[in-house]
Structures are given as structure tokens and as C-alpha cells.
Amino acid sequence: MQNLHNELRANSHLKHFGRLQYTLFLKGTGLSLEECLIFWRKSFKLITDDKFNKEYRYNIRHNYGDVGGDANRRGRGYSPYSCQKLITEPLPGPGQSHGCPYRTFATDNLIALLQRTGVADREVLSDIREDVKKHKYHIACNRVFEYTHKKEIKKVKEEGSWSAADLDTIVHPNTYFKRSWMLKHLGEGNAGIVGGGPDKMEE
């Protein structure tokens, strides 16, 4: 999702499948429809309100189940995409940025991206290369998560405050976000406020 966010910030735009993936992710974090509409309107700062309302607003509302057929409204729209869905979807075409970067990026570009985000350990980067080569994308992603949260993970393990299930392999972008948020806010007393639990996610 960080890749989609960076693309959005750089270009003030995402193509359809990138918008769909990111909108559903934001929905899974607990962002309301109104908040999501504001987010996209502010992000698409190079277009007019009229163009945004005509070309983009309806799709966002549809993703949330606010419009569309009865089944869509009853089901409250679409569920956030799981890792499995993202790595089995067709690869993005030119100008598109959706999907799982562990699968869609050339390995050297992926490593460069990870280095820019603070993954500096050569052994970790080497292991990620091997994981990607073997198409073990979720393992590579979890390796990055463990590296970037190693202090917090060590703390909850030592304290016994998290069960083994709480640290299971991550197989959903919203789980990645939620677990990261909770680890980074340990001891703040409100670490459970992030929405989008596993029951709300697409397997």
C-alpha cells in the first residue's frame, strides 16, 4: 500500500485498479465513506470538483456499498483484498501500480524501494531476493515486517503480552497495517481502535 500511496502523492492520481485496491484498504482500516471521499478529493488536486464528482465519486461510494444494486448495498460493498488475491491477479500494465510489489516489481527495483524505506540489513535483503525468486512473496513481506518492527516484537514476546496467534504470518494488507499500528503504539491504551478485523476482510 505504501507503493500506491507514494504513486498517488507523486502523480496526484491512480488508475482504476490502484484506486480500487487502495480504497478498499482504507475502508478496511476503518475510514468512513465521507473521510474516504475527502481523502481522494484532496489527493486528486489537479482536477476540478466537477470532474471528480462525475468520474470518481460514484466508484468510491459503490466500493462502500452506498450505491449500486441491492446485493451491493446489503453486503456493504466490496471487501479489502487479501495478499492471495493480490498475488494471483493479472499483472499491472503500463502506468498502473496496483498489486503486490513483491510480485510486480523487478527484484532490483524492489530492493531499492525497501532500502529507501529503511531496510538496510544485507542478510535480510538477500533473503528477500531468494524469497521472491521462489515466488514466496508473503514470506518476503513478513520478513520486512519482522525487520522493521523487531524491537516491538521482541518486547511483546518478552512480556508475553501477545500470543503466538497475534504474531502469525500476515496474509492480508489490513492485518499488516493493524499489527504495525498496534506495535508502534504499545502501551498507549488505545491500540485496539483500528477497524477492519479479519472477519471484515476478503480471504
Kindly label every feature range from the protein language model:
Residues 1-20, 24, 28-203:
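Basic, alpha-helical nucleic-acid-binding regions used in initiation and control of genome expression
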